[in-house]
Structures are given as C-alpha cells and as structure tokens.
C-alpha cells in the first residue's frame, strides 16, 4: 500500500503527539490486544500480563519505538524494520493476523488520547501506515 504525501504528513503529525508517550500508549495497546484477542497472550507465556506490569510497559515501549522508527523512515519502512521482520518471521513465528490486531488496538488508543487529532482523513492515513508496517513485518513469512 502506497502512502501519499498527505498520508505521510498525517502520520508524522499524529506521531509527533505520540512519541513522548511510548511506554504508556504501548502498554495500553498491548493490554487492549490481550483483552480483546486473548489468543495473542500465547506469545508471551513468560510475561506478567497484569495491568501495569513492568514487562508489558517495557514491551509496549519497544512496539511504539518500532513504529516511530518506521515513521522516521516512512519512505523505507521495509529497510527500517528488516531486522524486526526477520525476528518475528523466523524466530518468534508470530501469526501474521496479530499485527492487524495490534494495529487496530493502537488506533483505539490513539483515538482515546487524541480524539480531535484523529479526523477521518488522519484515521485513514494512520490505518494505511499500520497496514504497511504489518505487510513489512509479514513479508519474510513467505
């Protein structure tokens, strides 16, 4: 999915509001995903999955940091996330559908914290971006 110039501007605008809240928003996203899609917990058997867990916060921060990295290299998301793609495809073997679940939960968290920023146009751009990230992360599964 190709991001237009407007999409890139919209995504960068949203992430300028998000990047300072990586741990908080990342943890919220993971907690929401584990609640809405309990099967995703199977990839984290060694984690304390309780609300406020230090492990959830740390991993959530990593998730948002990876998204920020993708935003910072929005014209080369595949290059920016290549190592992460290898990790998820070859070592962790995460079911590709989970990236869609994560993206959806991230959109909800953004909507909760920045409702006025998430216009229909921005929502569509952010969704396209998250789909592009998911596509990159699953590209090496084939």
Curated annotation (Swiss-Prot):
Residue ranges constituting the Globin domain according to the UniProt record: 2-142
Tissues/organs with expression: Red blood cells.
Record field: transmembrane: none
GO cellular component, one term: haptoglobin-hemoglobin complex
Keyword Heme attributed: yes
Binding site for heme b: 88
Keywords: Heme, Iron, Metal-binding, Oxygen transport, Transport
Function: Involved in oxygen transport from the lung to the various peripheral tissues.
Protein name per the record: Hemoglobin subunit alpha-A
Organism: Anser indicus
Underlying gene: HBAA
């Amino acid at each position: 999915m190709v991001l237009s110039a407007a999409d890139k501007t919209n995504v960068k605008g949203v992430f300028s509001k998000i990047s300072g809240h990586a741990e908080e928003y990342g943890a919220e996203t993971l907690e929401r995903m584990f609640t809405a899609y309990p099967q995703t917990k199977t990839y984290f058997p060694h984690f304390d999955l309780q609300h406020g867990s230090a492990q959830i916060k740390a991993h959530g921060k990593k998730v948002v940091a990876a998204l920020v990295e993708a935003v910072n290299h929005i014209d080369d998301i595949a290059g920016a996330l290549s190592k992460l793609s290898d990790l998820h495809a070859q070592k962790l073997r995460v079911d590709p559908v989970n990236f869609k679940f994560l993206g959806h939960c991230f959109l909800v968290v953004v909507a909760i914290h920045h409702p006025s920023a998430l216009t229909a146009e921005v929502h569509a751009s952010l969704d396209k971006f998250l789909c592009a990230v998911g596509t990159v992360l699953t590209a090496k599964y084939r």
